[in-house]
């Protein structure tokens, strides 16, 4: 055969981050065989084309592989009949017909809306030598994209997809270690020398027919898997939807052959193509990796035998098969492109939602930071106020002894003020007494002055009389006896005048001395009064200052005392 199928398991770490596989060793299953069709009768085929090759891979690229339980579940799928009757929203449906035999001989029936169905079974396939009498109905050869499993029927919710039978997320075991080697399917396969004679009859086939027949191979050319796992693409293509049979698996291999190389992301997309959200079938536990490899080798031998039978009968029955499977392959490719577009749009929507949520979270974070900053400022201000109150409280506590000392000093100063007031009253009384004496002395002075004036007048009159007498005496010297008597009177008057003058001078001297004494006493009294007034004013000012300090201390401590005037009156009493 000229055509060769290749599967490339290029795992994407973004979509398959939860995959796991066995760690160290890997198993390589090399199969040199032709194309496979599960629709033909089985014949004997030698086991020369199968071997097992255990070797590690150089660079691991898969994140997760298949566990033994999941692998056996893909090899031995037995579902209940009620779960196999799945209807598609587009009007198409597959139903697997089970038989009572132990071998896997169940075949699907393709249904339409008008309840017409085409059975894909051994009895419905054309027999050898009778390709013109095919049992396919006309409905099986129709190629309608919308009628065959539309995108709306394939798209399930996330919860159902996570429970899907074909999802890679359900295939990995939690306790399985990571993969040590990637899935490395061989790009081409060579035929066994024992098969070269059988392939000579197929050289006359056209390229399109050969590719169509090659697409019927369920297990593709020889490939390499890690120990304890099988290719993810093989498992998903064989079990899309959980209820498709060998014919539908052949269609998936046809699609894979047409595509060339499928990434693990596309395989994960195909694995989600569940028709409904039914739970996965019960898995069977595998004893060891050798059992899994042995079963896989047995299946590959069976498929190789079927491929040889199909090659020998290709000239008889290639026309209906190629038409049907080419249409189905084209449908699957179109649906695969639509699924890619759908999931790309979903990825864009999710990224936009994540960006919006990130922006909202950044805005909330900024608001929270501003609120935190404001609360921190309020906390700092409250702490400052608390420190100020503590300082005031400490000052008030320290001002208690100072207040007591100030009160004691105020009481002392109040006593001194009262004593000075008493002295002031005594001095004022003495001043008043001295003032009375001064007034009396002034009266006496006036009287003395009046008396002196009278005496002066009398002395002036006497002097005039004496002058007149002398003039008369000088004019009349004859009358001597009379003159002697007059002379005696004059002498007497002169003596009296001299006495009066002396008395007057003595009185004036006494008055002057008294005046000087009074003036000195007056000056003393005034000076003493001024000193008392100045000391009183100074004490009054000091008292006012102390009272202000006391009031300030009372206001700082918060105590209420009586007014200073009443307190001073109390101290004086």
UniProtKB/Swiss-Prot annotation:
Keyword flag Zinc: no
Entries under InterPro entries matching the protein: N4BP3 (IPR033571)
Residue ranges, annotated region (Disordered): 119-138, 173-220, 384-405
UniProt keyword annotation of ATP-binding present: no
Keywords annotated in UniProt: Cell projection, Coiled coil, Cytoplasmic vesicle, Developmental protein, Neurogenesis
GO biological process: nervous system development
Basic and acidic residues composition-biased segments: 125-135
Disruption-associated phenotype: Morpholino knockdown severely impairs cranial nerve development, with shorter or missing cranial ganglia and reduced nerve arborization. Neural crest migration is impaired, although neural crest induction is not significantly affected. Brain size is reduced and cranial cartilage development is severely disrupted, leading to smaller head size. Eyes are smaller and deformed, with coloboma formation and disrupted retinal lamination. In eye, expression of the genes rax, pax6 and otx2 is reduced. In brain, expression of the genes emx1, pax6, otx2, en2 and egr2 is reduced.
Feature: compositional bias, Polar residues: 207-220, 392-401
A Pfam family matched in the record: Fez1
UniProt feature, compositional bias: Low complexity: 186-196
Coiled-coil positions: 287-474
Assigned protein family: Belongs to the N4BP3 family.
Protein name: NEDD4-binding protein 3-B
Organism: Xenopus laevis
């Amino acid at each position: 055969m000229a055509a060769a199928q290749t599967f490339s398991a290029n795992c994407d770490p973004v979509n398959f981050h939860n995959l796991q596989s066995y760690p160290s060793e890997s198993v390589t299953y090399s199969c040199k065989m032709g194309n496979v069709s599960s629709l033909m009768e089985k014949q004997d085929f030698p086991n020369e084309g199968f071997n097992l090759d255990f070797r590690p891979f150089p660079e691991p690229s898969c994140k997760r592989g298949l566990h033994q339980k999941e692998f056996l579940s893909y090899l031995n799928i037995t579902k209940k009949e009620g779960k196999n009757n799945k209807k598609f929203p587009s009007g198409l449906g597959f139903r697997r017909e089970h038989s009572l035999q132990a071998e896997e001989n169940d075949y699907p029936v393709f249904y339409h809306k008008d309840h017409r169905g085409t059975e894909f079974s051994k009895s419905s396939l054309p027999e050898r030598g009778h390709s013109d009498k095919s049992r396919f109905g006309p409905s099986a050869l129709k190629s309608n994209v919308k009628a065959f499993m539309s995108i709306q029927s394939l798209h399930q919710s996330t919860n159902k997809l996570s429970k899907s039978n074909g999802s890679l997320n359900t295939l990995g075991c939690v306790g399985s270690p990571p993969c040590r080697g990637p899935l490395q399917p061989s790009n081409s396969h060579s035929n066994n020398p024992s098969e070269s004679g059988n392939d000579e009859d197929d050289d006359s086939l056209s390229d399109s027919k050969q590719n169509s027949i090659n697409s019927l191979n369920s297990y593709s050319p020889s490939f390499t898997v890690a120990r304890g796992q099988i290719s993810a693409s093989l498992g998903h293509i064989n079990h899309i939807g959980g209820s498709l049979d060998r014919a539908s698996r052949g269609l998936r291999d046809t699609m894979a052959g047409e595509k060339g190389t499928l990434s693990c992301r596309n395989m994960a997309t195909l694995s989600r193509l569940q028709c409904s959200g039914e739970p996965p079938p019960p898995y069977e536990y595998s004893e060891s990796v050798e059992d899994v490899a042995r079963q896989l080798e047995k299946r590959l031998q069976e498929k190789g035998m079927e491929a040889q039978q199909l090659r020998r009968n290709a000239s008889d029955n290639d026309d209906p098969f190629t038409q049907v499977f080419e249409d189905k392959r084209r449908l699957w490719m179109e649906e695969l492109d639509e699924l890619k577009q759908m999931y790309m749009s979903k990825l864009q929507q999710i990224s936009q939602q994540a960006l919006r949520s990130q922006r909202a979270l950044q805005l909330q974070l900024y608001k929270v930071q501003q609120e935190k900053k404001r609360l921190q400022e309020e906390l700092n201000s409250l702490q400052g106020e608390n420190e100020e109150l503590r300082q005031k409280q400490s000052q008030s506590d320290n001002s208690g002894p100072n207040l007591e000392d100030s009160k004691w000093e105020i009481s002392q100063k109040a006593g001194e003020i009262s004593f000075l007031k008493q002295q002031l009253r005594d001095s004022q009384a003495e001043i008043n007494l001295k003032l009375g004496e001064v007034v009396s002395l002034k009266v006496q002075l006036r009287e003395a002055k009046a008396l002196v004036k009278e005496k002066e007048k009398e002395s002036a009159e006497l002097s005039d009389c004496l002058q007149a007498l002398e003039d008369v005496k000088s004019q009349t010297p004859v009358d001597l006896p009379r003159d002697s008597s007059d002379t005696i009177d004059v002498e007497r008057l002169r003596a009296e005048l001299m006495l009066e003058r002396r008395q007057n001078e003595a009185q004036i001297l006494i008055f002057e001395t008294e005046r000087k004494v009074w003036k000195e006493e007056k000056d003393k009294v005034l000076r003493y009064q001024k000193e008392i007034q100045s000391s009183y004013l100074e004490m009054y000012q000091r008292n006012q200052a102390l009272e202000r300090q006391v009031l300030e201390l009372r206001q700082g401590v918060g105590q209420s005392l009586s007014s200073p005037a009443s307190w001073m009156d109390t101290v004086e009493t």
